[in-house]
């Protein structure tokens, strides 16, 4: 089998994770920590790309990586327009939306730009894979009870789809042939209904929908939320923080550290026990609802993300949902590996690269 060497780039707010893979095998994985004072010199996140590019190249050189031997560069997908899942070639339309922050400004927007900047000088392809804006929801799933307020698809697409593919392989099937319920449990929690390779419904794990999580509120009583918003006690930013960042376990028990909460549970703390069980209860309830989306025809339920390492949490969830389908646990997440595998599928011609096309007010993914 021929060897494809792939450079993978995953930018964060103060760090850049990079990996070099020979096919699926990691040759180098490193987290580059950026000096906050250095980063602070740039007015916009997007202005950091040249600095980060040079830093990446220096690190590769220091490890003896010859970039002329690369076959492709793959970056973390950023806040683009809604697109279907898959591996996309970085093109001018995508670069424009990433640079302009079409759907928001975030460090992940640098992923496609850095991939392109490095790849173009080597005359090799640049890709992104399954960004958080992946949207494969069916029309019926978008409807909410208020006109003009459509449900949105924002979830852990990269890890959900990567793990779903691994489970399909484990079951000796193609991802596109199975119905799976995939639950990513980390700082946020998302439950996706995967129907034959498409996530046709999923809770918005960012903006207050679904189970509460270590630091997100999830679905809350809307009437009480409206009263709180107009009580005059809180600014808009404070309310947003209550939903994202200071919600969930942070609000209920004062920490987003699930390990600490587990220790409290093991010591018999009744409040911690009730709250941790409530989080598992809400995850199980979301899985149960998602099973109806797939008419109860489920090949497997998959639990993944950092919280899937928690035996207490996993056992609580299993107890409530294992009657629906077998529960398969794939703890943790490996974004670098997932990005490399997405690029590899295209390089091996197992799937065609998709093209990011902007037509007036819509984005079209053309395979």
UniProtKB/Swiss-Prot annotation:
GO-annotated molecular function: acetate kinase activity; ATP binding; butyrate kinase activity
SUPFAM superfamilies cross-referenced by the UniProt entry: Actin-like ATPase domain
Protein name in UniProt: Probable butyrate kinase
Enzyme Commission numbers on file: 2.7.2.7
Catalytic activity: butanoate + ATP = butanoyl phosphate + ADP
Family: Belongs to the acetokinase family.
Coiled-coil spans in chain: none
One Pfam family, short name: Acetate_kinase
Main location: cytoplasm
Keywords (A to Z) from UniProt: ATP-binding, Cytoplasm, Kinase, Nucleotide-binding, Transferase
Underlying gene: buk
GO biological process: acetate metabolic process
First-level EC class: transferase
Gene3D superfamilies from the UniProt entry: 3.30.420.40
Cellular location(s): Cytoplasm
Cross-referenced InterPro entries: Aliphatic_acid_kin_short-chain (IPR000890), Aliphatic_acid_kinase_CS (IPR023865), ATPase_NBD (IPR043129), Butyrate_kin (IPR011245)
GO annotations of cellular component type: cytoplasm
């Amino acid at each position: 089998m021929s060897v494809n060497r792939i450079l993978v780039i995953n930018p964060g707010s103060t760090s850049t994770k990079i990996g070099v893979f020979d096919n699926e095998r990691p040759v180098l994985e490193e987290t580059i920590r950026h000096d906050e004072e250095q980063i602070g010199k740039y007015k916009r996140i997007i202005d950091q790309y040249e600095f980060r590019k040079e830093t990446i190249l220096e690190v590769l050189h220091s490890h003896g990586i010859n970039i002329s031997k690369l076959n492709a560069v793959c970056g973390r997908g950023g806040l683009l327009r809604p697109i279907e899942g898959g591996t996309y070639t970085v093109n001018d339309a995508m670069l424009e939306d990433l640079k302009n922050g079409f759907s928001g400004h975030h460090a992940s927007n640098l992923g496609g730009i850095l991939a392109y900047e490095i790849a173009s000088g080597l005359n090799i392809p640049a890709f992104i894979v399954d960004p958080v804006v992946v949207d494969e929801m069916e029309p019926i799933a978008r409807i909410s009870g208020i006109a003009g307020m459509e449900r949105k698809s924002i979830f852990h697409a990269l890890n959900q789809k990567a793990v779903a593919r691994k489970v399909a392989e484990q079951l000796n099937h193609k991802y596109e042939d199975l119905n799976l319920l995939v639950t990513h449990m980390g700082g946020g929690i998302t439950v996706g209904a995967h129907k034959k390779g498409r996530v046709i419904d999923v809770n918005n794990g960012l903006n207050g929908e679904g189970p509460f999580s270590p630091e997100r509120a999830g679905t809350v009583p809307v009437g009480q939320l409206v009263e709180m918003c107009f009580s005059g006690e809180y600014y808009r930013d404070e309310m947003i923080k209550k939903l994202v960042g200071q919600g969930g376990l942070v609000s209920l028990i004062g920490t987003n550290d699930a390990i600490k909460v587990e220790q409290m549970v093991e010591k018999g703390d009744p409040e911690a026990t009730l709250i941790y069980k409530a989080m598992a209860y809400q995850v199980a309830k979301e899985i149960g609802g998602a099973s109806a989306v797939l008419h109860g025809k489920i090949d497997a339920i998959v639990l993944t993300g950092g919280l899937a390492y928690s035996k207490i949490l996993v056992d609580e969830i299993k107890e409530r949902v294992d009657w629906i389908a077998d529960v398969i646990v794939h703890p943790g997440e490996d974004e670098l590996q997932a990005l490399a595998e997405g690029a590899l599928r295209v390089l091996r011609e197992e799937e065609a690269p998709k093209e990011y096309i902007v037509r007036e007010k819509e984005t079209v993914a053309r395979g």
